[in-house]
Amino acid sequence: MPSILIVDDEPGVRSALGGVLRDEGYEVDAVDSGEACLERLGRQAYDVVVLDIWLPGMDGLATFARMRERQIESQVVMISGHGNIESAVRAIKMGAFDFVEKSLSLEKTVLVVRNALRQRHLEAENQALRAR
């Protein structure tokens, strides 16, 4: 079962998005900070991380940079309630799969997560073929 980690400091976002993704059949965990995200990723691999840009403490872009330094291979979907084009462009240049603005359209977010999972599957398949 595909696994998703939601990282957002707003309990309502974690609850609503987590509920919809669970209804889609995904295994979902949620944390409220960048630090908690990195700690969780140190213990468990996730296929997709839905990561808020504006987090208290370590923000989402810094968290994403640390994920890349640690070579964590999860697909990352960045979300933000402060639709800042500069942040979106920076996240995509860093390797984020996509950027979704809050107020989250749950249908759009599910579609983006589904596409990120498809991309993750293709990358894993490609690596397996290269290893032969």
List PLM regions with ranges:
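Flexible nucleotide-interacting loop at or near the entrance of a catalytic core
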Residues: K108-R132
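Short amphipathic alpha-helix used as the core "switch/output" element in two-component signaling
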Residues: E39, L61-E73, R90
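Active-site beta3 strand of CheY-like receiver
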Residues: A45-V50, L55, V77
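Acidic catalytic/metal-coordinating carboxylates
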Residues: S33, D59-A62
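Two-component/phosphorelay signaling modules centered on CheY-like receiver
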Residues: P11-D29
